[in-house]
């Protein structure tokens, strides 16, 4: 075993520290005597909190500075939420392990404990995600969507203070924080697709660091990997980022991998969905096929309009 101190690059939010702390604890349990420490890196997404993500522009808003630290060798690995990781990684970096996925669904959290169907006419829903906003508008065209940025505890506090009637969050974040009791209702992916990679954690490292890759190998979950690979293949096909309402969810049941994908217009008036199933060995092809079906069915026009805006 290595004598190195393994430095994990992480964002500084409570949730990010919980996720990276879980990886640290798992590595230390697997490799007794291994020294692992967390190193907080502030990202662009952490610094700009008063602008919707779609208007900030660019890709990798929550990972770029951590990847820069990896390439500069000031950290040895990085723990990311896979939904934040761009479809194409920087040269010299790879995802070394993807542990077992948490619940990938979105959830509604309301002040009254009532679900989305019971919100008042013109109710105010907080989210900074175009994907979530588009799908909510499809379900409830009367709803007012208001920008909501900040970490998970800030979002919950703003809801409690009355700034919103409801907010939409990732189930995985609430679960990892032990705050399942805050969930009002889970949004079924059959009606409301999550973000690409949502609920999955990716551990990124330098391609030339075989020592760290070996340490991470026992943390890797093959079933989660093939599901996320299919979703990310869809994302690459659509060339999407934070600026576009794209959703995707893949799951493996009895040896069959099924992927559903979605592209919506900003106003939610147009929403295209497609799905394919096949062998896990075809994960990338399934992602490409779903992406091409979406593009050919009308999503290409929507994406071109968004990119021109």
From Swiss-Prot:
Swiss-Prot/TrEMBL cofactor(s): dipyrromethane
GO cellular component labels: cytoplasm
Pathway: Porphyrin-containing compound metabolism; protoporphyrin-IX biosynthesis; coproporphyrinogen-III from 5-aminolevulinate: step 2/4
Residue positions, PTM S-(dipyrrolylmethanemethyl)cysteine: 242
Record SUPFAM superfamilies: Periplasmic binding protein-like II, Porphobilinogen deaminase (hydroxymethylbilane synthase), C-terminal domain
Pfam families xref list: Porphobil_deam, Porphobil_deamC
Taxonomy, superkingdom: Bacteria
GO molecular function terms noted in the UniProt entry: hydroxymethylbilane synthase activity
Disulfide bond positions: none
Presence of keyword Transferase: yes
GO BP terms, alphabetized: protoporphyrinogen IX biosynthetic process
UniProtKB keywords: Porphyrin biosynthesis, Transferase
Cofactor note: Binds 1 dipyrromethane group covalently.
Catalytic activity: 4 porphobilinogen + H2O = hydroxymethylbilane + 4 NH4(+)
EC numbers for this chain: 2.5.1.61
Enzyme class: transferase
Additional observations: The porphobilinogen subunits are added to the dipyrromethane group.
Family: Belongs to the HMBS family.
Subunit comment: Monomer.
Biological role stated in the UniProt entry: Tetrapolymerization of the monopyrrole PBG into the hydroxymethylbilane pre-uroporphyrinogen in several discrete steps.
The protein's name in its UniProt record: Porphobilinogen deaminase
Organism ancestry: Bacteria, Pseudomonadati, Thermodesulfobacteriota, Syntrophobacteria, Syntrophobacterales
